[in-house]
Amino acid sequence: MAIRLGINPITWSNDDLPSLGGDTTVETILSETWAAGFAGTEMSFKFPKTSRELGPLLKRHRLELVSAWYDGRIHERDIEAEWAAILPHMTLLRDLGCAYVVYADTSLRSEGDLFAPISRRPKLADGEWASYGKRLTALAERMAEFGVRMAFHHHMGTIVETDQEVDRLMAATGPAVGLLYDTGHSIFSGGDPVALLKRHVGRVVHVHCKDARKDLLVGARATDEGFMQAVL
């Protein structure tokens, strides 16, 4: 099976902190993506938000849309409310031929929390995992019926951050919940990305290949820096 690689535009311009790469144009991002040998790109906050505009733009640069991040809130919302909120995003992805949506649950987090100390990020209580898994599975099944599958992104600063939390998530959810396996976030959270992949390779539907500079990571954890502060 041939493997085609895409890249995230955050390499050029940061969605969470627009001042990082804020002056980099969409044309620069897309032309350099193609020049670097990538076949596709994930979404940027700078890209058009309609398939009518984004489709021709990507085609002009000989690229495809791989997927796009969504700030999920299924822990806080019921399924109907979450589905109504995500439907425009899902429609864009389906219109442009994407197979998966990058779904990260940012429940219990407010603006600026990415700068909060790592130790203060939100967590699920032990008794919440079973009901959370059922609700997430039901949402993922609806996504699959719509034509775009869920790729759940474990991410620093969210309720599913550590390898152990990924384990609990996979145990509490059905097969409709695919895993976005992210090496960098596993490392940052103190995990073992190789062992994590071995345990859940059958659920992986999307991959983010990232690294982490050990000296900066050790320093960030020692001083309890926030995720974005560590990035800076």
PLM regions with names:
Residues 8-25, 44, 71-83, 121-130:
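Active-site mouth loops of central-metabolism enzymes
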Residues 23-27, 48-52, 76-87, 163, ...:
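Structural motif corresponding to alpha-helix initiation and N-cap regions
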Residues 39-45, 64-69, 101-103, 151:
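Short, well-structured secondary-structure segments
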Residues 41, 133-232:
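Acidic/histidine-rich catalytic cores of soluble enzymes
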Residues 79-181:
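Active-site acidic/histidine proton-transfer and metal-coordination neighborhood
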